[in-house]
Amino acid sequence: MARIAGINIPPHKHAEIGLTAIFGIGRTRARQICEASGIEYSKKIKDLTDADLEKIRDQIALFTIEGDLRRETTMNIKRLMDIGCYRGFRHRRGLPMRGQRTRTNARTRKGPRKAAQSLKK
């Protein structure tokens, strides 16, 4: 089993798909990495040589991935919240921040519905 950037890459998958197991690498970037390292992206991970894996590791080292990327994203959101801008306010309240409607929908961001409170007298 190939281990790249601290992640076990599934051996039975093609190189292009297997690399997407790493946080921060999607299909497009995986294809770019394969092309830059001279590896056919339809080749399975288990068929790659150690030299091929080393070339892939060198290419991946050029990008921000995994823990560093998660930390950077978290810090960007925290910065928005600290400066008190609109997007930071929406993050703090757990609402959509890109102009979507919230009267209906927005359930993914707001979470499950709260039960309606009954009025007792």
UniProtKB/Swiss-Prot annotation:
Belongs to the universal ribosomal protein uS13 family. Residues 93-121 are annotated as: Disordered. GO terms for biological process: translation. It holds the Pfam family Ribosomal_S13. GO terms for cellular component: cytosol; small ribosomal subunit. Gene3D superfamilies: 1.10.8.50, 30s ribosomal protein s13, domain 2. PANTHER family: 30S RIBOSOMAL PROTEIN S13/40S RIBOSOMAL PROTEIN S18 (PTHR10871), SMALL RIBOSOMAL SUBUNIT PROTEIN US13M (PTHR10871:SF1). This is Small ribosomal subunit protein uS13. Keywords: Ribonucleoprotein, Ribosomal protein, RNA-binding, rRNA-binding, tRNA-binding. Located at the top of the head of the 30S subunit, it contacts several helices of the 16S rRNA. In the 70S ribosome it contacts the 23S rRNA (bridge B1a) and protein L5 of the 50S subunit (bridge B1b), connecting the 2 subunits; these bridges are implicated in subunit movement. Contacts the tRNAs in the A and P-sites. One of its GO terms (molecular function) is tRNA binding. The keyword Transport does not apply. Part of the 30S ribosomal subunit. Forms a loose heterodimer with protein S19. Forms two bridges to the 50S subunit in the 70S ribosome.
